[in-house]
A protein has these predicted regions:
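Acidic/His- and Gly-rich active-site-bordering loop/insert found
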Residues: 2-105, 126-130
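Phosphate-handling active-site elements
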Residues: 98-100, 120-135, 211-222, 319
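Predominant activation on well-ordered alpha-helical scaffold segments within soluble catalytic domains
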Residues: 12, 39, 115-122, 149-152, ...
Length: 322
């Protein structure tokens, strides 16, 4: 077991462990092996380690170095999962250091950040510190963020640092998102019987036009001072069963990127406004909406003490857009 405090060697170890998210690639390795590695590493360096695994095979690790008391607590947060190994040029699990850069699956997003947090936390924990230090290394960031949600049901802190790749910019705000499936309902019929059929795909075109108009409206709307305006787009469309029939339904998957003040409820209201306006002039227009994943936007004030301290420490101003 390598318990190195050398960030380059630690990063090599992390890259070499397959941790592809099985929600993205069915049957993929997931996080168990890499969770075992970081648990042993933190235990060796004197941390108390808690393994959270409400979904079997999807563990998140929280390593804790208790403070002496009277100080503020700090949580480091990062994810252990990666996207697919497919399509990688070379062996994705064989890290290569070339011209001062490390190459391997997950290096950028975000095993380099994980290694940096582990080393930093161990360094602080080895010295007197009044506040608790927590390192939350979570499962399933690449799909549903379930790992961080599970951690936050058990732990909190006065401040948190997430070492996602930001090109070393300090990011104090981030957009959220809301996913919806909008299904337009028609009536199936043989292609020779237009009198019996209602073409769901043709009627879905009206919704797509309304969605495009909303996208342009959002682009013109004054937005968040850091994040700018939200946006919306149709991501996936499915409909029909065969070329010789009128389609009974057409489903459009929609993603809405939100800024503070926006939520799944406000997005659903926007979609229903478009759909109801179509129905008002077309009595045959029928639809249903199914909500999907939602992640709320966030914004930390630049005058927040932790924000100011981070900017002073790095001699950087917060990123102007994220």
């Amino acid at each position: 077991m390598n318990t190195t405090l050398d960030p380059t060697e630690l990063l090599r170890e992390l890259i070499s462990i397959d941790s592809v998210n099985p929600d993205l690639v069915p049957g993929a390795a997931g996080e168990p092996a890499i969770a075992d590695f970081v648990s042993t590493w933190f235990t060796h360096h004197g941390f108390t380690v808690d393994r959270l695994e409400s979904t079997p095979g999807r563990p998140s690790i929280v390593a804790i170095a208790a403070g002496s008391g009277g100080g503020r607590s700090l949580m480091f947060n990062g994810h252990l999962d990666t996207v697919t190994l497919a399509g990688y040029d070379g062996d994705p699990l064989a890290p290569i250091l070339e011209d001062g850069k490390m190459f391997g699956r997950g290096t950028f997003d975000m095993k380099a950040g994980v290694a940096a947090m582990m080393i930093a936390a161990a360094d602080v924990a080895a010295r007197p510190h009044p506040g608790d230090i927590l390192v939350a290394l979570v499962a399933d960031e690449e799909y549903a963020s379930a790992g961080t949600e599970e951690v936050l049901r058990h732990y909190t802190a006065d401040a948190a640092i997430v070492s996602e790749p930001t090109h070393e910019e300090i990011v104090l705000a981030h957009r959220g998102f809301a996913w919806f499936d909008v299904t337009i309902h028609g009536v199936a019929a043989h292609g020779s019987r237009p009198d019996l059929g209602i073409d769901a795909i043709a009627k879905a075109g009206r919704f797509l036009t309304g969605l495009d108009e909303l996208a342009h409206k959002l682009a013109r709307t004054p937005g968040h001072p850091t994040l700018g305006s939200g946006n919306i787009h149709a991501s996936v469309i499915t409909g029909g069963e065969e070329i010789s029939s009128y389609p009974a339904q057409c489903t459009i998957s929609v993603e809405r990127r939100t800024v503070p003040g926006g939520s799944s409820k406000t997005v659903e209201a926007e979609l229903r406004e478009i759909l109801d306006s179509i129905k008002a002039v077309d009595p045959q227009f029928e639809y249903s909406i199914t909500p999907g994943l939602e992640r709320n936007p966030f914004s930390v004030p630049s005058e927040n003490p932790s924000s100011k301290r981070s900017c002073r420490s790095s001699n950087e101003s917060p990123a102007s857009h994220r």
